[in-house]
Amino acid sequence: MSKNVVIAEQEKNNEHCPEDINDKLSESTDDDGEDTSDEDKEEDSNPNKDTHAPLELMTEFLRAEMGHDYHLAKKLCQMILIYEPENPEAKEFFSLIEEMLLMEKAQNLEEDDDESEEDNSESEGESTEDPSEESSDECEDG
């Protein structure tokens, strides 16, 4: 083979290479486009597949939880569970919130009992103090 023939063949190969590369690139981008359209179709056909609670709902829940407003936190947690029934964190928080509410209720009942006992002892103490105060007033007048 002569040098001219070899050079001519290389030029032919070089001419075809860019086209081949462009074809391969367009094929790969076409494949990518098809993949995304398939994913879009899957998402459209099953809209409840990955339903998430709104971010605002989540932040309000965290604010209520951190602010120890357990009644509000319980309601917000229930709403999150409506959106995401299988959310493990929401399930765990829900049971913990219920425990906290029971503890608060028990504590409030104890405080109410303590206050009622204090009220009873104060009213008994006042009734014994009243006659002595009146007698001291009478002494001053005399």
UniProtKB/Swiss-Prot annotation:
Basic and acidic residues bias: start-end ranges: 9-27, 44-53
Domain of life, source organism: Eukaryota
Disordered: annotated segments: 1-55, 104-142
InterPro entries with a match to the protein in the record: ERICH2
Acidic residues bias: start-end ranges: 28-43, 109-142
Protein name: Glutamate-rich protein 2
Species annotation: Bos taurus (Bovine)
Gene name of the record: ERICH2
